[in-house]
Swiss-Prot record:
Signal sequence residues: 1-25
Biased composition (Acidic residues): 93-103
Region listing for Disordered, in residue ranges: 93-118
Gene Ontology BP terms: alginic acid biosynthetic process
Job description of the protein: Has non-porin-like, channel-forming properties and probably functions as an alginate permeability pore.
The protein's name: Alginate production protein AlgE
Pathway: Glycan biosynthesis; alginate biosynthesis
Subcellular localization: Cell outer membrane
Domain of life, source organism: Bacteria
Origin species: Azotobacter vinelandii
Keywords annotated in UniProt: Alginate biosynthesis, Cell outer membrane, Membrane, Signal
TM regions (residue ranges): none
C-alpha cells in the first residue's frame, strides 16, 4: 500500500472512530461539540520573482473543508480535525502552514525537491490531540507569533491565571499527514524542539517575562553542492541552538484591551554550535565547519488607542547579521514561527513583516507604522506601512516571500546595498454572528465566527534587488469562512 493510500485509509479510519467513540457520542452539548469550517480563498499574486524567471504568480480559488469533533469528560478532552482542499492553483488557505508559504532561493534558479511540492488538492489529518499530547497548535502565551505559532506533534502544557502565565513543551515533526507530501522538509527531519516561558503581571496590565527554546538536530548535511542546487530545502545546518528572551508587555497583542497605551518590547539572544558543509572547488563536501553562534534580535511596539474605534501605532524589529570563518552573528528564528499577530490592536492576525514580502528576522531591519479603525463590532480595518533594510549589505536574507534570481549578470541581491524596499498592507474584515464556535473550544482556530476578509499587500522593491525586472509585486487574498 502506498503512503498516500495509507494516509487516506487513516483519514477514513479516524472519521469512523470519531463516530463510534463514546467520548464523542450523543447530542451536541456543552461538553460534546462537532462541526465543520468551510473556507473559500481567492488569491492573486504577481510576481514573487520580480520578473527574473518564469512563474512566481498565483491566480485561483480554493475550497477548504475542515470537519472537527471536540469532546470533554472530566479533566480529559480530545479533538480531531480533518481537512480536504480542492483548488485551481497552489492556493494558500492556511497562512500558518509552512508548506503553503511562497519562497525561493535567490542564489539560483533550481526548484526544490519535487516530493515536497504541494498539490492543488489534497486530504489531510490536520490536528489530533488528547489532553496535552498530539498534533496541535503550538502558540506562545504572549501571542506575538515570532516564536511559536504552528501545528506540530508535541506535548504542550500551559497555565494561565490572572497574575501568572506559564508554558512548557517538547515538539518534533514525524509526518505531514497530507496525501500530497511524501517527505518531511529537510529542516524538520531529526530536529527536536524543547520550549517554555513564564510571564508575571507585576502591575495591573503590565507583564514581564521570558521565553526559552532549544533545538537539537542530529541529521545529515548534503554531500555535495549539487545536492543543495537540486533541493533548495536541503538541511542547511545541524547542531544545537538555544534562544533566550526577556520581554515587557502591556496588552500589545490583546485585541480586547481597553488601556489607552499598549506596548511591547523583547530582546532575544541566540547562542549555540552548529555544523555546516564546506564545499571544495569540485563541489564535494570536503569537510564540515563547526560554527559558534552568538546573535541577537529586538522587537518593539507601541500603540495609542485614541478611542474604542481608532488607534495608531509604530513597531520596529531587527535581527543581527554577520558571518566569520568559525563564528556567526546571524540571527535566525526558531522555525516554529508564523510571524502573524494582532499587533494592530484588532482581532485579525496580520503578518508582522508584510503580507506581500513576508520577511523572516534574519539580516533584516523593519520599521512599521499602522492605524486601525473599527466603526462597529462586526467590521475592522488596518492600514500598515513597512520599510525594509538589510542589516549587513553583504549577507543573504532569511526565507521570505520575495525570491528573485540572478539575471543578465546582475545578482539577486547587490553587495553594498541595504535598502530592500517598502510595502503597504490593507486588511479589512467583516464578521458575522452566525457560525460562532462553542464557548469552551476554539483555541485551535484564529477566528471565533464566520467572516469575509481582504488581505492585501503591495511591495515596492528597492536598490538591493539588483536583478529585478518589476517595480512592484502584490499578494491579495479574499477569505470567506463559514461554520456549521
Amino acid at each position: 500500500m502506498s503512503r498516500k493510500q495509507r494516509i487516506s485509509a487513516g483519514l477514513g479510519l479516524g472519521a469512523s472512530l470519531l463516530c463510534c467513540n463514546p467520548l464523542f457520542a450523543g447530542p451536541v452539548g456543552p461538553d460534546r461539540n462537532f462541526g465543520m469550517e468551510v473556507k473559500v480563498t481567492a488569491q492573486s499574486e504577481d510576481d514573487r520573482d520580480l520578473d527574473t524567471r518564469s512563474g512566481g504568480d498565483a491566480e485561483g480559488i480554493a475550497l477548504d473543508l475542515r470537519p472537527w469533533v471536540y469532546g470533554q469528560r472530566g479533566n480529559w478532552g480530545a479533538m480531531v480535525m480533518l481537512q480536504a482542499v480542492a483548488a485551481t492553483d497552489i492556493i494558500e488557505t492556511d497562512p500558518t502552514d509552512p508548506n503553503e508559504e511562497p519562497g525561493g532561493d535567490p542564489a539560483n534558479g533550481f526548484s526544490r525537491d519535487s516530493s515536497r511540492d504541494p498539490d492543488k488538492s489534497y486530504l489531510a489529518l490536520r490536528e489530533f490531540e488528547l489532553g496535552t499530547i498530539g498534533r496541535q497548535r503550538i502558540r506562545s502565551l504572549t501571542n506575538e507569533g515570532t516564536w511559536w505559532d504552528i501545528h506540530m506533534e508535541s506535548v504542550n502544557w500551559t497555565m494561565d491565571t490572572s497574575l501568572l502565565r506559564a508554558q512548557a513543551g517538547v515538539a518534533k515533526r514525524f509526518d505531514e499527514y497530507r496525501t500530497d507530501l511524501d517527505n518531511l522538509s529537510a529542516e524538520d527531519k531529526d530536529r527536536t524542539h524543547v520550549f517554555g516561558g513564564l510571564d508575571y503581571q507585576w502591575r495591573q496590565g503590565h507583564w514581564a517575562g521570558f521565553k526559552v527554546h532549544h533545538t537539537s538536530d542530529d541529521g545529515d548535511l548534503p554531500d555535495s553542492q549539487m545536492d543543495v542546487y537540486e533541493d533548495r530545502q536541503s538541511k542547511s545546518y545541524t547542531g544545537d541552538l538555544t534562544w533566550l528572551s526577556v520581554h515587557l508587555d502591556r496588552d500589545f497583542f490583546n485585541p480586547r484591551s481597553t488601556l489607552p497605551i499598549n506596548y511591547w518590547g523583547e530582546f532575544t539572544w541566540l547562542t549555540g554550535e552548529m555544523d555546516r558543509s564546506h564545499f571544495a572547488s569540485d563541489g564535494s563536501a570536503d569537510h564540515y565547519k563547526d560554527v559558534d553562534v552568538d546573535a541577537w534580535a529586538v522587537d518593539l511596539g507601541l500603540r495609542w488607542n485614541i478611542s474604542d474605534r481608532w488607534n495608531v501605532g509604530a513597531a520596529y524589529a531587527r535581527g543581527q547579521a554577520g558571518e566569520g570563518d568559525d563564528e556567526s552573528e546571524q540571527f535566525m528564528q526558531t522555525g516554529l514561527q508564523s510571524n502573524r499577530s494582532t499587533f494592530t490592536g484588532l482581532q485579525t492576525r496580520i503578518h508582522r513583516f508584510g503580507e506581500a514580502s513576508r520577511g523572516e528576522l534574519t539580516n533584516l531591519q523593519v520599521g512599521t507604522l499602522f492605524t486601525s479603525w473599527k466603526p462597529r463590532e462586526d467590521l475592522e480595518t488596518s492600514l500598515i506601512y513597512h520599510k525594509f533594510w538589510r542589516v549587513d549589505d553583504d549577507e543573504d536574507l532569511g526565507q521570505n516571500g520575495i525570491s528573485p534570481i540572478e539575471k543578465d549578470g546582475k545578482p539577486a541581491l547587490k553587495a553594498g546595498e541595504k535598502d530592500l524596499g517598502q510595502e503597504v498592507d490593507l486588511i479589512i474584515t467583516r464578521y458575522f454572528n452566525q457560525g460562532m464556535l462553542p464557548a469552551n473550544w476554539g483555541g485551535e482556530l484564529d477566528e471565533q465566527s464566520a467572516l469575509i476578509r481582504l488581505r492585501s499587500g503591495l511591495f515596492f522593491p528597492s536598490n538591493a534587488y539588483a536583478s529585478k525586472g518589476d517595480s512592484k509585486m502584490h499578494r491579495v487574498f479574499v477569505d470567506m469562512i463559514w461554520r456549521f
